[in-house]
A protein has these predicted regions:
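Terminal alpha-helical segments
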Residues: 1-132
Length: 132
């Protein structure tokens, strides 16, 4: 069952969308490429970071670069713990993994790592927003 919808310009709705991407990333759907699931892991973090920026009343560009979004969060006065900053490496799944021939196929261990990282980032963002 989908979560309660909120207005699209609220941190709550961005967190809902991040949680939806996490659910998709975790689902090992038969016939799905692992790189497609990793794309959703990246999207989870992107949307969760954007929820934090909205919460801190900061605008953001519609970009996929997690390092840039992390920098914007820190510029808002909120330091990112090292284990959260570590998730910026998921940016590579925003484009390369979605199209044939851009990169090597994702391995099971890489997928599991991406899911763990995005899950950790989403939990941190929820904590920042007090949205448990």
């Amino acid at each position: 069952m989908p979560p309660e919808r909120h207005p699209p310009d609220t941190p709550a709705e961005w967190l809902n969308r991040a949680a939806s991407d996490l659910a998709i990333a975790r689902a090992k759907i038969e016939g799905a490429y692992l790189e497609d699931l990793c794309y959703h892991a990246q999207q989870c973090v992107e949307k969760a970071f954007k929820a934090v920026l909205l919460h801190r009343q900061r605008g953001f560009p519609y970009i996929h670069d997690l390092a840039e979004l992390a920098n914007r969060i820190e510029l808002s006065g909120l330091p990112l713990p090292a284990d959260i900053r570590d998730v910026v490496g998921l940016t590579e799944y925003a484009v390369e993994g979605r199209y044939p021939g851009f990169d090597e196929p994702v391995l099971e261990e890489q997928w599991a790592d991406a899911v763990e990282k995005c899950s950790r980032a989403l939990e941190w963002c929820r904590d920042v927003l007090g949205a448990r």
